């Protein structure tokens, strides 16, 4: 019997408490000049909301996203006319800006559209539940095995020309399952479940593999975080069992807007990334697409997967705080937010400050009323009046050769 005096001797597996995220090993998939998977940095994506028939507005929207860090841009393609416009969009980007990796989003009965866009873009996204759309029958209550397989054969015949086209051009495809648009036969067979989502994706993957096409990225999105988490985890389990090391595109679809939309997306995307699952992400907000990009990079930075901005460490303030912490943090952030690769700590007092900011490159710590101490790592460099604190912090960073002008 285990007691406090006689604790268990079972050895602790230190790997369980490793502070490094060990990412799932996946194959590399090229999308234009960006690589998804294969150990490359997690890629940030978004989607424009312009009508792609409007060439000028679409080019401007793609450029706005790319300039703020969106590495792959998706566009919707509801018709053949839209598909043909993508060639002109891609050409105008190259002439007036630079090439940007583009993904075409294809849905209902999209074979002809997909074949056209495959000539124009770097990746095609298809939705297995809608690519070969079977109109629901109100009187149906089941699918026989023969009926299930018959539709499977139709899917293969419809998908094959696109797979061959992308394979021969060495372009990519995303098999993008949505919880809200599973096909009727998957719903009858597996229910409205993560299992149904996974089986829907696997059916399309197996068709691609049978045609020796492997440039695949997989997604299983849902608007409810628990469903999304379960689907991705089950997908990883099944792919590992089947030897399918395909990269995963993470997202919570229809997350909404504001704080809750950001929290909801972070709960889903961040949880999986922390488990080593995920190679590219999109935060879907009911806001301007440009507002999605900072959320993506913040998630990646918080998990230590990509460092693209200053990491600020700051205490929540308490009765020991010797200056207006909120105002000072704002001043420090405004002065240094253009820098990259630095950790800067702003701490209210010396009780916990030096210890809790030990990993920071620079520290700004309340010393006594009216004065603060500046640190380089663990070393206290100088004590200055708080009115000079931000200016002297900048001077310290400059002295170390780590400052760049905004």
Curated annotation (Swiss-Prot):
Keywords, in A-Z order: 4Fe-4S, Iron, Iron-sulfur, Isoprene biosynthesis, Metal-binding, Oxidoreductase
EC number(s) stated in the UniProt entry for this protein: 1.17.7.1
Entry's cofactor comment: Binds 1 [4Fe-4S] cluster.
SUPFAM superfamilies xref list: Nitrite and sulphite reductase 4Fe-4S domain-like
Catalytic activity: (2E)-4-hydroxy-3-methylbut-2-enyl diphosphate + 2 oxidized [2Fe-2S]-[ferredoxin] + H2O = 2-C-methyl-D-erythritol 2,4-cyclic diphosphate + 2 reduced [2Fe-2S]-[ferredoxin] + H(+)
GO biological process, one term: isopentenyl diphosphate biosynthetic process, methylerythritol 4-phosphate pathway
Signal peptide, first to last residue: none
MF terms in GO: 4 iron, 4 sulfur cluster binding; 4-hydroxy-3-methylbut-2-en-1-yl diphosphate synthase activity (ferredoxin); iron ion binding
Domain of life, source organism: Bacteria
Binding residue positions for [4Fe-4S] cluster: 315, 318, 349, 356
TM annotation in the entry: none
Principal EC category: oxidoreductase
Pathway listed: Isoprenoid biosynthesis; isopentenyl diphosphate biosynthesis via DXP pathway; isopentenyl diphosphate from 1-deoxy-D-xylulose 5-phosphate: step 5/6
Cofactor(s) listed in the protein's UniProt record: [4Fe-4S] cluster
Protein's job: Converts 2C-methyl-D-erythritol 2,4-cyclodiphosphate (ME-2,4cPP) into 1-hydroxy-2-methyl-2-(E)-butenyl 4-diphosphate.
PANTHER family: 4-HYDROXY-3-METHYLBUT-2-EN-1-YL DIPHOSPHATE SYNTHASE, 4-HYDROXY-3-METHYLBUT-2-EN-1-YL DIPHOSPHATE SYNTHASE (FERREDOXIN), CHLOROPLASTIC
Family as reported in the entry's similarity comment: Belongs to the IspG family.
Record protein name field: 4-hydroxy-3-methylbut-2-en-1-yl diphosphate synthase (ferredoxin)
Source organism of the structure: Trichodesmium erythraeum (strain IMS101)
């Amino acid at each position: 019997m285990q007691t406090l005096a006689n604790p268990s001797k079972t050895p602790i597996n230190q790997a369980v408490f490793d502070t490094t995220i060990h990412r799932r090993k996946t194959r590399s998939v090229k999308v234009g000049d960006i690589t998804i998977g294969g150990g490359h940095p997690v890629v940030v994506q978004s989607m424009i909301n312009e009508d792609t028939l409007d060439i000028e507005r679409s080019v401007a929207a793609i450029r706005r996203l790319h300039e703020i860090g969106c590495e792959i841009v998706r566009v919707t393609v509801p018709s053949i006319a839209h598909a043909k416009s993508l060639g002109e969009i891609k050409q105008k980007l190259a002439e007036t800006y630079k090439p940007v990796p583009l993904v075409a989003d294809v849905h209902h009965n999209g074979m002809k559209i997909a074949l056209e866009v495959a000539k124009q873009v770097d990746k095609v996204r298809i939705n297995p539940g809608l690519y070969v759309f079977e109109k629901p029958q109100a009187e149906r209550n089941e699918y026989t095995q023969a009926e299930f397989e018959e539709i499977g054969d139709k899917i293969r015949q419809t998908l094959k020309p696109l797979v061959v086209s992308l394979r021969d051009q060495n372009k990519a495809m995303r098999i993008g399952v949505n919880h809200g648009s599973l096909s009727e036969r998957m719903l009858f067979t597996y229910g409205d479940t993560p299992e149904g989502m996974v089986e829907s994706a696997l059916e399309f993957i197996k068709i691609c593999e049978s045609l020796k096409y492997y440039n695949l990225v997989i997604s299983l999105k849902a608007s409810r975080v628990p469903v999304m988490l379960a689907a991705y985890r089950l997908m990883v389990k099944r792919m590992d069992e089947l030897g399918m090391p395909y990269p995963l595109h993470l997202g919570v679809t229809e997350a909404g807007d504001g704080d809750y939309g950001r929290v909801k997306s972070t709960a889903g995307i961040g949880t999986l990334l922390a488990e080593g699952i995920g190679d590219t992400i999109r935060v879907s907000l009911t806001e301007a697409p440009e507002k999605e990009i900072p959320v993506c990079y913040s998630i990646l930075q918080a998990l230590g997967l990509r460092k693209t901005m200053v990491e600020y460490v700051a205490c929540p303030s308490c009765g020991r705080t010797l200056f207006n912490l909120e105002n000072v943090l704002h001043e420090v952030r405004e002065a240094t937010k253009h820098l990259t690769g630095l950790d800067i700590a702003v701490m209210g007092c010396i009780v916990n400050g030096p210890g809790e900011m030990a990993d920071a490159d620079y520290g700004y710590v309340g010393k006594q009323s009216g004065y603060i101490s500046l640190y380089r790592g663990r070393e206290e460099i100088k004590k200055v009046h708080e009115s000079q604190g931000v200016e002297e912090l900048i001077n310290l960073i400059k002295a170390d050769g780590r400052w760049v002008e905004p």
